[in-house]
């Protein structure tokens, strides 16, 4: 048998295994001890170390459930809620498949401008994610009929087909309506919408989805939530539940505008245009200088104690973010260093103290401190310390430490009960400490003598968000959004409060320079900008009062150990039918799922043929119960027809496969190492029907049982960015060693495979991303009496999942474009491909009102070469060789699902084996092959 292409899984079970395993690894560390708090509507899973936060979460979850159920239909069944504390970043996510479940990360968003407007972090994130469950679980009409028969089948939830601004807009609308915070009433989304409107970049309802172009992931949240806010103002609060009910039963689930009109009597486009149009008139150009522009992350400025240098974050979306240092007077760049995400920093003397995220285990992402010394040396100071927001002054460094559900300061005498700290900043003379403090549902600005933390005084304690404290001599600069936009204010002892900026789209993160000017960041339609301007002091308007805050009431809870089965059990099934001609007509079912923690993931299918009576199917299980390594077990059987003799005797083949493996993985932010060791079984058997000796009807039908093992090594280091068309730096290495021995026979097979992928930034004509040079080299060999041959040639495609197992595309280990698959065969093979990739256009536009869109386009010029040969023969790697070009289109289907299409033409540079004519070959492929 020749193996030209890397085959896709032949069993539905194995095709699903990667999906369920991937979902499991995307959550929390499922190993170790977990407990469960059972409430009326939730199973809340937590580690014993997060018990206090879990009890808080139980109260907030039931509060959110009660408020949402007053307006929306309650979801079916008990909701599994996982309280994770493995990532030092604020986030959460929800899913309605295989059952209703959500995950909340306990770390609070202390300085994230998009999330800092909250009265209680767990309240806000739980309300947001639970709204997704209420919304997406709702089904009516024929969708409910299908689910009543087959269960919670993927693809039968109509509200999941709508554009992302609907789901995220609804969740953001309710997070703001049902809590004392939220992004609708915060200022960050106002900045997003004002900047887009002023630049004429307002998104339509079909473009406010997850396109790559700026503002990227902010758009669905900002546009969607403000639309639903306006709709509720125009048609009443009840219009929102009516809209959800309408979309939950519509036959064509992509429609939005019709259901808006039927639910509210309002026109989608008219209401959509109303909000941003009001903002356009506010566009003015402030006085000052732009120092950095079109950045994807806020370039927070930090001025060195001597006032001569400025550190800021440079993230243009084209390559990895960098921490840069520039001369404060001339803005001449002095040095730079690549950083990860979650980056915050400050000067301690002439050294930069940097906090950033990185993997500390396979599952855990922690914020640790690094020191960037004046000589350019970069040294890690802590590991697994959970230290965030370093601020320094007068030679003193203060860094809050994250704890489950909050953070703490290691300062004796400071009252920290019920407090979440923002930035804590020592004064330049080290006599005072200023901080932003979240307490009793809102932020305030506080100050205390460095030697007497118990003498804390509240300087500003009003409504809105207070953030970004910075010293200006003995005065304090800070940011407040009392006017609806964030602006910089100045507090000085004995003087009235002043507002010192009036930036049209807001100003954040102030830093004072020795000449009296200010550095600050602002938001535009092209991204973040860093400005330098003179302060313009004005008296701010009367300050709003802080809203009252009430804790969620106690709820009855029952604590148990974690039990996987309630969420692990099958939640759906689908029928299977296979017609294998004379080998049997099979009917059966399949299912798959995972538990709430992602500790186990499985897939199962079984089918039976009545005549002749046979069964086929498969089972696959992945276990992350140990954390590292992961274990996997799979087994499958399949029947197929070989031939039918002239006498009507049917010869069928039975293929059996089984494997038991263990995978060990180590990870860093841009690097990983993974090794899998597996024991494997493969069996082939033949059956004649009616039964008789096989040798009399099929000479080559020999039963084989092969037992062996394999080792697979993957090593990688990749540097990429949101706009990148490919990694612009890095290497991926895959190596496979396998041995199989046929039982009862001296036949054996050894196999070695290796593939190297290499990427480097290349000179180009510019554009929205960097040009990239990419290399792929692959080689393999097989030896032994049972060795099969490799096939070289053909186009290798990525794989696009259609859901429920089926996929489009398929990869080849030894492709050479311009030739047919397996044009040459042998037990030795090697290929090499070189590509030059260039960006063409960043589009980010829907195709009319259809749920498809064009995200971006790029192109590639390539050259391929390869050969296959037998041991003892001379390799001719130019035997197959070609050159050509590809147009690469990144598109979206179903509004937000990304799909990459490659349309290419390859010119063979050598005559195909067998004497076929040499002519250009066109092709269409899916996804990226490398």
Language-model region placement:
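Outer-membrane beta-barrel initiation region
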Residues: 296, 522, 527-529, 534-633, ...
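Extracellular/periplasmic ectodomains of large secreted or surface enzymes and adhesion receptors
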Residues: 262, 268-307, 313-314, 337, ...
């Amino acid at each position: 048998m020749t193996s030209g292409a890397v085959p896709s899984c032949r069993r539905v079970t194995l095709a699903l295994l990667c999906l369920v395993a991937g979902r499991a690894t995307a959550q929390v560390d499922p190993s170790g001890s977990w407990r469960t708090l059972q409430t009326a509507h939730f199973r809340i899973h937590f580690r014993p170390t997060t018990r206090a936060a879990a009890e808080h979460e139980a109260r907030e979850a039931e509060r959110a459930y009660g408020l949402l159920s007053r307006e929306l239909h309650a979801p079916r069944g008990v909701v599994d809620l996982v309280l994770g504390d493995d990532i030092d970043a604020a986030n959460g996510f929800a899913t309605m498949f295989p059952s209703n479940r959500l995950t909340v990360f306990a770390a609070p968003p202390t300085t994230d401008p998009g999330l800092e407007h909250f009265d209680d972090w767990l309240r806000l994130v739980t309300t947001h994610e639970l709204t997704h469950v209420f919304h997406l679980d709702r089904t009516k009409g024929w969708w409910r009929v299908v689910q009543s028969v087959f269960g919670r089948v993927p693809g039968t939830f109509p509200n999941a087909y709508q554009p992302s601004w609907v789901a995220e807009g609804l969740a953001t609308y309710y997070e703001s309506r049902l809590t004392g915070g939220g992004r609708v009433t915060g200022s960050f989304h106002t900045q997003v919408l004002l900047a887009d409107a002023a630049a004429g970049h307002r998104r339509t309802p079909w473009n406010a989805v997850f396109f790559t172009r700026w503002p990227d992931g902010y758009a669905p949240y900002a546009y969607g939530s403000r639309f639903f806010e306006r709709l509720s103002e125009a048609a009443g609060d009840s219009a929102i539940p009516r809209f959800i009910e309408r979309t939950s039963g519509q036959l064509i689930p992509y429609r939005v505008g019709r259901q808006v009109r039927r639910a509210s009597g309002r026109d989608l486009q008219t209401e959509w245009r109303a909000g941003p149009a009001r903002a356009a008139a506010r566009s003015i150009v402030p006085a000052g200088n732009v120092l950095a522009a079109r950045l994807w992350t806020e370039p927070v400025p930090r001025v060195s104690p001597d006032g001569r240098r400025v550190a800021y974050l440079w993230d243009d979306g084209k390559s990895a973010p960098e921490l840069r240092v520039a001369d404060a007077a001339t803005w001449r760049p002095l040095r730079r260093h690549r950083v990860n995400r979650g980056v915050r920093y400050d000067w301690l003397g002439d050294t930069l103290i940097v906090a950033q995220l990185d993997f500390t285990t396979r599952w855990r992402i922690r914020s640790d401190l690094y020191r960037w010394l004046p000589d350019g040396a970069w040294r890690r100071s802590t590991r697994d310390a959970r230290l965030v927001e370093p601020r320094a002054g007068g030679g003193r460094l203060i860094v809050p430490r994250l704890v489950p559900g909050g953070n703490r300061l290691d300062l004796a005498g400071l009252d920290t009960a019920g407090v979440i700290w923002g930035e804590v900043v020592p004064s330049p003379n080290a006599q005072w400490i200023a901080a932003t403090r979240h307490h009793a549902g809102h932020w305030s600005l506080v100050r205390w003598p460095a030697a007497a933390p118990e003498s804390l005084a509240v300087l500003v304690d009003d409504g809105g968000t207070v953030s970004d404290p910075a010293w200006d001599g003995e005065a304090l600069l800070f940011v407040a959004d009392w006017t609806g936009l964030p602006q910089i204010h100045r507090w000085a002892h004995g003087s009235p409060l002043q507002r010192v900026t009036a930036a049209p789209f807001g100003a954040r993160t102030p830093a004072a320079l020795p000449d009296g000017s200010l550095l600050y960041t602002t938001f535009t339609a092209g991204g973040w900008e860093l400005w330098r301007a003179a302060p313009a002091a004005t008296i701010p308007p009367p300050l709003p009062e802080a809203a009252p805050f009430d804790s969620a009431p106690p709820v009855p809870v029952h604590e148990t150990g974690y039990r996987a089965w309630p969420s692990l059990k099958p939640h759906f099934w689908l029928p299977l039918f296979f017609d294998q001609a004379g080998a049997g007509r099979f009917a059966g079912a399949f299912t798959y799922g995972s538990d709430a923690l992602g500790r186990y993931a499985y897939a199962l299918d079984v089918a039976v043929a009545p005549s002749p009576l046979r069964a086929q199917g498969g089972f696959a299980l992945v276990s992350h119960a140990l954390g590292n390594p992961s274990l996997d077990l799979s087994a499958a059987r399949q029947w197929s027809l070989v031939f039918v003799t002239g006498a009507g005797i049917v010869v069928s083949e039975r293929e059996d496969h089984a494997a038991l493996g263990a995978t060990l993985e180590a990870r860093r932010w841009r690097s990983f190492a993974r090794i899998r060791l597996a024991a494997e079984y493969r069996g082939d058997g033949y059956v004649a029907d009616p039964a008789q000796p096989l040798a009399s009807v099929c000479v080559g039908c020999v039963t084989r049982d092969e037992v062996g093992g394999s080792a697979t090594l993957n090593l990688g280091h990749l540097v990429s960015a949101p706009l990148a068309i490919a990694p612009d730096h890095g290497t991926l290495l895959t190596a496979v060693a396998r041995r199989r021995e046929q039982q009862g026979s001296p036949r054996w097979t050894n196999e070695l495979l290796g593939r190297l992928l290499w990427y480097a930034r290349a000179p180009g004509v510019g554009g929205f991303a960097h040009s990239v040079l990419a290399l792929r080299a692959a080689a393999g060999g097989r030896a032994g009496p049972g060795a099969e041959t490799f096939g070289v040639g053909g186009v290798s495609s990525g794989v696009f999942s259609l859901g429920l197992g089926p996929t489009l595309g398929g990869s080849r280990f030894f492709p050479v474009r311009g030739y047919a698959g397996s044009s040459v065969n042998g037990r030795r093979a090697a290929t090499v491909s070189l590509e030059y990739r260039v960006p063409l256009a960043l589009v980010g536009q829907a195709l009319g009102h259809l749920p498809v869109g064009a995200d971006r386009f790029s192109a590639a010029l390539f050259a391929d070469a390869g050969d296959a040969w037998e041991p003892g023969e001379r390799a001719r790697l130019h035997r197959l060789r070609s050159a050509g070009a590809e147009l690469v289109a990144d598109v979206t289907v179903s509004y937000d699902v990304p799909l990459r299409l490659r349309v290419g033409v390859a010119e063979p540079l050598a005559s195909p084996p067998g004497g076929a004519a040499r002519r250009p070959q066109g092709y269409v492929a899916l996804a990226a092959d490398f």
